[in-house]
Amino acid sequence: VLFRSGLGQREQDEELAVAVRTLKALAIETGVALVVTSDLPTVVAGRNDPRPGLGDFGALGAVKAHADIVLGVYREEMHSPGTGVEGATELRVLKNRNGGTGYVDLYFYKQWLRFEDMLDPDR
């Protein structure tokens, strides 16, 4: 989402909320899934546990309020190079309006930009 220059944080938050509501209405009207991506604040990387949480979305409150599902991706090697299993990834279900939350262990194949279930790669 691009904001007009000169807007304060409050005005940007309001514009973002309008954009998110409009996108949600469009998704419902067309029956098409909508994927919104976001970087989290750099303060997350500096925590003892840098795994993403729903509270980390801060100014993106409109996104987490209107989203049916919110996912977070955590790769230990991105925060502590040389530790853990290379390619190991946690896909964290932070919000699921119609189901449970938790995480799935995935493996990231960087040469193909592909994730697979770490426990059942044939699935």
Predicted regions and their residues:
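C-terminal regions of RecA-like/P-loop NTPase motor modules
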Residues: 5-10, 14-31, 42-123
